[in-house]
Amino acid sequence: MHLQYHDLTIRSALPSDAPQLVCWWNDGAVMAHAGFPLGLGTTVEKEAARLPAPGRLMLEYKNQPIGEMNWRDVGENAAEIGIKICESVFQEQGLGRIYLSLLIKELFARGFSRIVLDTNLNNTRAQHVYEKLGFRKVAVRENSWNDQLGNPQSAVDYTLTPEDFMDYAV
């Protein structure tokens, strides 16, 4: 996949991206929201061997990697997505909603009729972005999983249909 909007690029992750991905994934500050406050503890060799992987995407701003996205077909004409703007200086800039818009448009164009995702209940910044894009909150799962340290976590489930989609990449 390769999607471009001004200085923003979404592209398929390659084995050469493994060092950057591992740097982010092993950083507890980057991964805490996903339940890994100590990072994943993975290696460049292990991750390079998994790439390219269907649905694993790199986010670039002016050709500089700043984060990653993923998507997968979950059946019933739905795609599940995820995003991390990993470089903190690029957070809170409105880039996430543009990257999400680009991917969502592409997935709807591929015939998916619904996009689903979940996020940590404590991740209110992400919830705000998802709701601006038109996602509807469908469930809150209280204490439904434990993070890497054994702390109970809650999740919010969202769904989006083409009719509700607010495109920020126009």
Regions found by a protein language model. Give the residues of each.
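Conserved N-terminal entry element of GNAT/NAT acetyltransferase domains
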Residues: 1-16, 161-170
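Helix-loop element at the rim of GNAT/NAT acetyltransferase active sites that forms part
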Residues: 4, 12, 23-38
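Hydrophobic pocket/interface hotspot
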Residues: 21-22, 81, 115
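Acetyl-CoA-dependent GNAT
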Residues: 34-90, 100, 106, 161-165, ...
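Active-site acidic-Proline motif in GNAT/NAT acetyltransferases
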Residues: 87-93, 121-122
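Conserved acetyl-CoA-binding loop-helix of GNAT-fold acetyltransferases
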Residues: 92-106, 128-132
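Short glycine/proline-centered loop/turn elements that form peptide/ligand docking sites
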Residues: 96, 100, 122-126, 143-149
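Conserved catalytic-core motifs of GNAT/GCN5-like acyltransferases
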Residues: 116-118, 136-153
